[in-house]
Design a protein with these regions (language model features):
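Extracellular/periplasmic bilobal clamshell ligand-binding domains
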Residues: 107-144
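Substrate/cofactor-recognition hotspot
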Residues: 78
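Periplasmic-binding protein-like
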Residues: 82-105
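Extracellular/periplasmic catalytic domains that process cell-envelope and extracellular macromolecules
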Residues: 22, 41-43, 56-58, 69-73
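A bilobed periplasmic-binding-protein/Venus flytrap-type ligand-binding module shared by bacterial periplasmic
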Residues: 59-71, 90-91
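Ligand-binding pocket segment of bilobal, Venus flytrap-like solute-binding proteins
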Residues: 1-52
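Stable alpha-helical elements in mature extracytoplasmic
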Residues: 17, 36, 71-75, 87, ...
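Solvent-exposed loop/turn segments at secondary-structure junctions
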Residues: 34-38, 54-57, 70, 84-85
Length: 144
């Protein structure tokens, strides 16, 4: 509520939200994806990336294979490639968090350096509708 009272704006998806900061339209971005910010900073944008002192949620990007995949061998080979040295280095160079703990990022915070919140998933699901309605109400007030 305090952020909304301070003129919170919801400019759009990740790229649009970050551009609002880099163009000076707004002074901060809350809850953006960090890899876009690291990329922009590497390109010379005058921004910094901060994680909340109390922790944040890290959203993993899993790879899955359908039980009904028509070419199971190729699907497994692709997932194996995703975790290969080559692919994990590409992930790190794209400012994403590698899926393997032995691959480190030189140009961003590594997973072990980011304090993570341990969500209470049951509580979150039980309160999801009410929380979503409140966030939508706050966002609508400033972006209406």
């Amino acid at each position: 509520e305090a952020i909304a009272a301070n003129g919170m704006k919801v400019p759009g998806a990740n790229k649009a939200a970050l551009e609002a900061v880099t163009t000076g339209e707004v002074g901060a971005l809350v809850a953006g994806v960090d890899y876009n910010a690291y990329s922009s900073k590497a390109k010379g944008e005058p921004i910094d990336i901060y994680y909340p002192a109390g922790g944040t949620v890290v959203n993993p990007r899993p790879a899955m294979i359908l039980k009904t995949a028509t070419n199971m061998d190729n699907a497994k080979a692709f997932v194996d490639y995703l975790f290969s040295d080559e692919a994990q280095e590409l992930v790190a160079k794209a400012y994403l968090l590698p899926g393997r703990s032995d691959v480190k990022c030189d140009s961003r915070s590594n997973l072990e350096d980011i304090l993570q919140i341990k969500p209470d998933w049951e509580k979150m699901m039980a309160e999801a509708s009410e929380d979503s309605a409140k966030v939508n109400e706050l966002c609508s007030a400033n972006n209406g």
